[in-house]
């Protein structure tokens, strides 16, 4: 029988077993519903983390300068095509509409990593500056994969307990808000687990959140 612990205990266990490098903290949500592949949510984290890829024309590249943002056009696409691991560590990618057809060259690299820009979530836009500013301000979005599981990175162990705990709480509340009004939470979410890059996962008592 699997052990289920409080969110506080789960995060503290990850922090206690942390390695020397700044591991990411990931959450996996399993749903009961057969329609879970359609679940998605957009929300805002209190504490931002991660890096952003931006595919756009040169005039748009100088609008928002930040160390967490990498801009580029076709030359960036070729860099990623030549070195797949280039995208490691990036959390989101944005694109201007004219660039979308060109991204087909690296769709097989971006897609499995959840980095293919999606217009449904405002990631394909002419207003690159506004989209970048929103993400750096904490905007986050997640959707279930083909297996009906929602994976989310809520931060890095270097952020410390308090920031991770608050990001985790906001993420869970945003997921819970996608529940139909006539369905109880325990009939909607099957399980929620947290894990770090090198650590074991812990199942969380999400009903106590």
From Swiss-Prot:
Signal peptide: none annotated. Gene3D superfamilies: 3.30.190.20, 3.40.50.790. Keywords: Repressor, Ribonucleoprotein, Ribosomal protein, RNA-binding, rRNA-binding, Translation regulation, tRNA-binding. The keyword Repressor applies. Coiled coil: none annotated. Belongs to the universal ribosomal protein uL1 family. Part of the 50S ribosomal subunit. This is Large ribosomal subunit protein uL1.
